[in-house]
Swiss-Prot record:
Function according to Swiss-Prot or TrEMBL: Component of the membrane attack complex (MAC), a multiprotein complex activated by the complement cascade, which inserts into a target cell membrane and forms a pore, leading to target cell membrane rupture and cell lysis. The MAC is initiated by proteolytic cleavage of C5 into complement C5b in response to the classical, alternative, lectin and GZMK complement pathways. The complement pathways consist in a cascade of proteins that leads to phagocytosis and breakdown of pathogens and signaling that strengthens the adaptive immune system.
Keyword hit for Transmembrane: yes
Signal peptide start and end residues: 1-20
Cellular localization per UniProt: Secreted; Target cell membrane
Membrane protein topology class: Multi-pass membrane protein
Glycosylation-annotated residues: W44, N437, W542, W545, W548
Descriptive protein name: Complement component C8 alpha chain
Positions of the propeptide removed during maturation: 21-30
SUPFAM superfamilies: Growth factor receptor domain, TSP-1 type 1 repeat
Domain MACPF, first and last residues per copy: 135-498
PANTHER family referenced in this protein's UniProt entry, alphabetically: COMPLEMENT COMPONENT C6 (PTHR45742), COMPLEMENT COMPONENT C8 ALPHA CHAIN (PTHR45742:SF1)
Disulfide bridge positions per record: C39-C74, C50-C84, C53-C90, C96-C108, C102-C121, C115-C130, C140-C177, C375-C399, C497-C544, C499-C515, C502-C517, C519-C528, C551-C584, C562-C574
Domain EGF-like, residue spans: 499-529
Amino acid sequence: MFAVVFFILSLMTCQPGVTAQEKVNQRVRRAATPAAVTCQLSNWSEWTDCFPCQDKKYRHRSLLQPNKFGGTICSGDIWDQASCSSSTTCVRQAQCGQDFQCKETGRCLKRHLVCNGDQDCLDGSDEDDCEDVRAIDEDCSQYEPIPGSQKAALGYNILTQEDAQSVYDASYYGGQCETVYNGEWRELRYDSTCERLYYGDDEKYFRKPYNFLKYHFEALADTGISSEFYDNANDLLSKVKKDKSDSFGVTIGIGPAGSPLLVGVGVSHSQDTSFLNELNKYNEKKFIFTRIFTKVQTAHFKMRKDDIMLDEGMLQSLMELPDQYNYGMYAKFINDYGTHYITSGSMGGIYEYILVIDKAKMESLGITSRDITTCFGGSLGIQYEDKINVGGGLSGDHCKKFGGGKTERARKAMAVEDIISRVRGGSSGWSGGLAQNRSTITYRSWGRSLKYNPVVIDFEMQPIHEVLRHTSLGPLEAKRQNLRRALDQYLMEFNACRCGPCFNNGVPILEGTSCRCQCRLGSLGAACEQTQTEGAKADGSWSCWSSWSVCRAGIQERRRECDNPAPQNGGASCPGRKVQTQAC
């Protein structure tokens, strides 16, 4: 087979019209492509009992083997549900004694919260049939909730890096009327109907929900626009991954920048999948990349540590979990409410765009990537952190001539093949506009809209089972231990360590139930096994953790090996520990 390939390539070199890409391919050192691996799912589990509060039953199947190296993909989902009827009464929380119990979910409330004007039950039953409403001392109906409170209340899936359903109840106030002062309320507004200027008194104070211990508005300020330059897509991906890991304080399942990238696993695809697919189009060509990035903070917050009031939907799902371990039911709970919950963080927004630059064309124009970056970023009207100045072959006048790269024709004239934008936070109108129109007005308008439409941009978090320690629901230790055990199993089932090996410093990526290797420039093939550079250093990558050993003397351990693949030609060994222990 190899002789035939070599003969064909030899004939091609003697023919006219051979492309540059074909010449590159001729210099590629061929290696055996690993055999394709077909995706395998387990058989469906038995249906769960009918959930009486939902009138639904569930079943699941496990990912036995993700497909690799072009193998057949799996079809269908790993979760299934069906309607059902249960003869069992809807499960309630333990009896509330002298306290009030919400009709639908069984939440317990202190009597002073009944008929106080606040709806503390999701079904409003605490405010039904009230002859005398004991209103809170101060009229709180005039205050809007603090911006972003619903976002901070959500669970978080550390594998998909996506939000899950609510863990905290962001609409519960505990009978209190605590407000947060907004220092920028004095900003003048214009009422076009009445043709008058006025102060935004309605935005002077915001009401703080019970589960928020602290919330402090920040004067609108960005971190400055930074620019970074990359010679290949892999280095850029590693940096983006590291930034995402740095945004949260617990990194279970993520690992250092050199470990496998986790994207879109379980039942959904990460929002980053489209970004990776766009970037992957430029991986095998001679492109370089400039990443322009800014982060805007609008507020800091800290959540309550003890006596947490859970969202009523989560409370109901929690009460329906059996005390006996059932991975399917507990994994479904994790899939719905996240692997982790947020304990503190910052609100605001993030804006970044990546310039894909044709290196050969840029050099023929006599300009640099810094010149191009300055020309594009200057349209935002913000200073760069590294004080880039327009220079080289691209003068300020030349930049203006092409309109700052605002049209496709102008971009092509400055060697910019594509622009990949990502915007988080802000009103939908301004964030969408910023992705398409990089102007000073659009950027500043987006920044102002972040004050009242922020997302969580930096945060600390804890594993989801820890929240059960900090509620007032009573003894839940059996469920907490089951949830902890299921979380370990869930994180291993959907980990990119199951992909690979990806050779020549390729990066394994797990998308849904499919694995692929992101190859560096100069490498290609399903496993990046073909390379143009003979004897180049290739770093090692970890295998998955083994199962936990039997408990001995209160300690158990698990291991992993640096063989997925092993280092080659003097490449670096895997970072981190080979053995992990825990109390048992």
